[in-house]
Design a protein with these regions (language model features):
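Hydrophobic transmembrane alpha-helices and immediately adjacent juxtamembrane helices
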Residues: 1-269
């Protein structure tokens, strides 16, 4: 119990310091809010335009797409808040910045994850929440306890899946000793799979994103389970499955991170 309290106090301290450092530049924060709102609203408007022209996307109407899109942007924002440090692991490996983690008598994964609480990620959450609430109204989703729990499971699972993929890509730097950044490529893949129904893709791609590279569990399957409760052939809500997938993927990526730390050679070696 004493150890848990210690780690919680350290996490709170790290978070407070990260927030204070971000608030030193308030105009930058305001700029991010405006830019991200414009970015996501324009993206959503593009979906509305396509639906108006063709009637649906992958069999999904405008109302369902609004709900799916909002859920995707929310999980993206949460992932950026908690896991943005994974984007820069290559530079940290090359510059020897992991030395400080090794010198502290604390869990390495804990230190890395709580070292940077990205307040700017909330600038993605704001427009995501707006679109999500709009989508909830459009699909007439009843916000009872069961649906709230399903939404929370979906967001937690989607956030963990995104963080797991980012951490896996970043951990490759321990072996490649390269600053190559796959963030843009992975982000594009996330957008294509989580913001649109995977029914727009061929069956082999749907199977790929469901079983081998389970990005469809970020939003598509849990959202479909909420909008079409009878679609699942398993007795467990799809949102709960999404959370389980996220936990398994994140645990696996943490294991790869630990393996990579054994290969870490500091700077100049």
């Amino acid at each position: 119990m004493k150890t848990i309290r210690y780690y919680v106090s350290v996490a709170v301290m790290f978070t407070r310091l990260s927030i204070q450092s971000r608030l030193e530049y308030p105009f930058m924060l305001i700029g991010h809010v405006l830019a991200n709102c414009i970015q996501w609203v324009v993206g959503f408007a593009a979906i509305k335009f396509v639906v108006d022209q063709f009637g649906s996307i992958g069999g999904w109407g405008y109302e369902s797409l609004a709900f799916l899109y909002g859920m995707s942007v929310l999980s993206h924002g949460l992932a950026v808040v908690f896991f943005i440090q994974t984007w820069f692991m290559g530079y940290q490996v090359i510059e020897g910045e992991f030395d400080r983690y090794l010198l502290r008598p604390m869990n390495l994964v804990f230190q890395f994850l709580f070292d940077d609480f990205n307040l700017i990620g909330f600038t993605d959450i704001i427009p995501g929440l707006m679109v999500f609430v709009y989508g909830c109204i459009k699909v007439r989703l009843t916000l009872n306890l069961a649906n709230v729990l399903l939404i929370l499971c979906t967001l937690a699972g989607g956030t963990l899946i995104r963080g797991a993929v980012w951490m896996f890509c970043g951990s490759m730097s321990f072996w490649t000793k390269s600053t190559a950044n796959f963030t843009d490529m992975v982000g594009e893949l996330f957008e294509r799979v989580s913001m649109y129904p995977i029914t727009i893709y061929p069956r082999w791609a749907q199977a790929l994103f469901t079983f081998l590279l389970p990005l469809a569990w970020i939003t598509f399957w849990p959202v479909r389970g909420m909008l079409e409760p009878g679609v699942s052939v398993i007795p467990v809500p799809l949102a709960v499955v999404a959370l389980a997938v996220g936990l398994l993927m994140f645990a696996g990526s943490c294991g790869i991170f630990r393996m990579g730390m054994r290969k870490y050679e500091s700077a100049g070696s």
